[in-house]
Structures are given as structure tokens and as C-alpha cells.
Amino acid sequence: MAREFSRTRRIAQQLQQELAQVLQRDMKDPRIGFVTVNDVDVSRDLSYAKVYVTFFEEDEKLVQEKVEALDAAAGYIRSLVAGRMKLRVMPELRFIYDSSLVEGMRMSNLVSRVISDDEAKQKQHGDQQDVSQSSDDKSEGED
């Protein structure tokens, strides 16, 4: 059983590489544009493959249109990949938008903004302390 899992994982990895090449080099559909294949999850019986993809687009409507274009071309993409892989049965492809990359970038930007805001507040607070200390030093010197 463990051997079955490793075989499906190896097939998924090879399928991911082949899909990335096919989508980059062989697909001429302008609706799809630049697509990145993040992961491929193959069923145990190799009949289905979930292909997780991302795009540079953030607009949900455009992303949905691109996923629909990929789904419409799934049979053609499947035939191109089947010619490159030596499998008895080529899995049926299902394209799924993977928003984890976009969410990760959004979270990274939020963290960076909070850090820069915090540094600005600390600097401002430090400048205020310097001003109050220098005024205290001047008042002590007058006595």
C-alpha cells in the first residue's frame, strides 16, 4: 500500500512538470495567459487529477474566466501530456484555482506594513524622549 502512494506521488510530480511545460509552450489561448501549476493531486486509481493553478490576476472574474478556459481545453491538454508520459491511463484533469499564493503575499504585505508602522512609532517615541531629556538637562544646568 505504501508503494501505491509513492507511485501516485511520483506520477503527480511528473504530471505537474509536464503540465507546466505544456501550458507554457504549447497553449496558444490568449484567455489563459501566464499560468503557474502549484500542485497536482492524483487519485489512487489514477483516473482523476486535481491541478492547482495560480495566475497573476487578482480579479476574481478574470481568474474564473481563466479557470473555465483551462477546463474547456482540458481534453486537449490531457492529450498533449499523454504523448509525453508513458501511462496506460491518463488521468482526467480538473483545474482548481489555488489562492494560497495570493493570500500569502497579502499576509506578508500586512506584516511588513505593521512592522514599518511600529518602527515609525518607536522612532517617534524615541525622538520625544530625547527632546524631554534634553529639556530636563537644560533645567538642571540652570540651578
Swiss-Prot record:
Protein's organism: Shewanella sediminis (strain HAW-EB3)
Lineage: Bacteria, Pseudomonadati, Pseudomonadota, Gammaproteobacteria, Alteromonadales
Purpose of the protein: One of several proteins that assist in the late maturation steps of the functional core of the 30S ribosomal subunit. Associates with free 30S ribosomal subunits (but not with 30S subunits that are part of 70S ribosomes or polysomes). Required for efficient processing of 16S rRNA. May interact with the 5'-terminal helix region of 16S rRNA.
Protein family according to the UniProt entry: Belongs to the RbfA family.
Record keywords, A-Z: Cytoplasm, Ribosome biogenesis
The gene coding this protein: rbfA
Compositionally biased intervals (Basic and acidic residues): 116-128
GO biological process annotation, one example: maturation of SSU-rRNA
Cytoplasm recorded as keyword: yes
One of the record's GO molecular function terms: ribosomal small subunit binding
Name this polypeptide is given: Ribosome-binding factor A
One GO cellular component, as annotated: cytosol
Region described as Disordered: spans on this chain: 116-143
Localization (cell): Cytoplasm
Transmembrane segments: none
Domain of life: Bacteria
Entry keyword annotation includes Cytoplasm: yes
Subunit structure and binding partners: Monomer. Binds 30S ribosomal subunits, but not 50S ribosomal subunits or 70S ribosomes.
PROSITE patterns found in the cross-reference section: RBFA (PS01319)
